[in-house]
Amino acid sequence: MSDYYEILGVPKDADSDEIKKAFRKLALKYHPDRNAGDKEAEEKFKEINEAYQVLGNDERRQTYDRYGKEGLNGAFGNDFGGFDFGDIFDTFFGGGGFNKSRSQRYDDAYDLDSEILVSISFKDAFFGVSKDIKYKIKKPCKTCDGTGSKDKKLNTCPYCGGSGKIVKRSGFLSFAQTCPFCKGSGQIVKEKCHDCAGKGFIEEQVNVKFDIPKGVNTGIRIRIAKKGNISKSGEIGDLYVAVQVKDDKFFVRSADDIYIEVPVFFTQAILGKTIKVPTMHGEKELQLKVGSKDKDQFVIEKEGFENIRTKIAGNLIVQINVQTPKKLTDEQIELLEKLHESFDKTADGIFDKIKNWFK
């Protein structure tokens, strides 16, 4: 599939409004209702919808910009790939005449699946960590049996006649929009339940214990089955844990590799001394090359993050920051002068080459 930005015909720095407008225009153009029997238009419509599901979501867009589609597959478990044709109406017209996914049904006022954000340290992301988190789930109100009505009775919505939809026209197109009064249920309550304020559900605090595997990065979602919201029929959704990894003071992550900048005295760099560098597993020795320069990089293999899928560890890249003294004693100046004199012939030879270049 082409680049998502190319599919929607927008630049990579497009803002959310530009992306939304481009999606709406293309989705209306290629919608199956306007292209009955046209398989090519149907495939194009699917591509457009998938592109918008990524670019229209800030978190997914950031992951896509950084890692491409492969990064989305890892970070979001490919949960954005499927769609139904009602998505376009849900986004722009408040609902459509298509089936809802399992996540939300017309007889429930909330999604079955729930999501929480968990922030962890750089160290916990490297080694993995166990968590015990408190969060809230939605469940049917027992007082009104999930109806939201004081007398537990529901009445037919007078605005949509119980269909749950209101038809709107735009030019030669007709759109079935979710009824804004009954929220698509086709039913309303006369007097609200006091315990749930007419919502039909209450929120309850629960806790869950789970493991975050080593190697996770910001954007990863962990699915915990049967720990989400509860429907009136007793069906339980899943809990999705969105992981956010905090930045470290010294280490910087790039994919599975870790970067660190280490200060090195100029004599250590020139002489190629052995230095000690911090790693996630503790200090390790690193042999510098003779004549090392500022910003030179050295690789310590297998000291990076372990890849969640392949279980292969990345590397630690050490970049040296060569330090030179700002103040010198008389003795140090004398020693450096002697060292400089010993290199005079070499320096003169280099200067002669530069002069010859201009002739």
Swiss-Prot record:
Bound cofactor: record note: Binds 2 Zn(2+) ions per monomer.
GO molecular function, one term: unfolded protein binding
Entry's localization field: Cytoplasm
Positions annotated as zinc finger (CR-type): 128-205
HAMAP family named in the record: DnaJ
Quaternary assembly: Homodimer.
Protein name (Swiss-Prot/TrEMBL): Chaperone protein DnaJ
Provenance organism: Campylobacter hominis (strain ATCC BAA-381 / DSM 21671 / CCUG 45161 / LMG 19568 / NCTC 13146 / CH001A)
Lineage start: Bacteria, Pseudomonadati, Campylobacterota, Epsilonproteobacteria, Campylobacterales
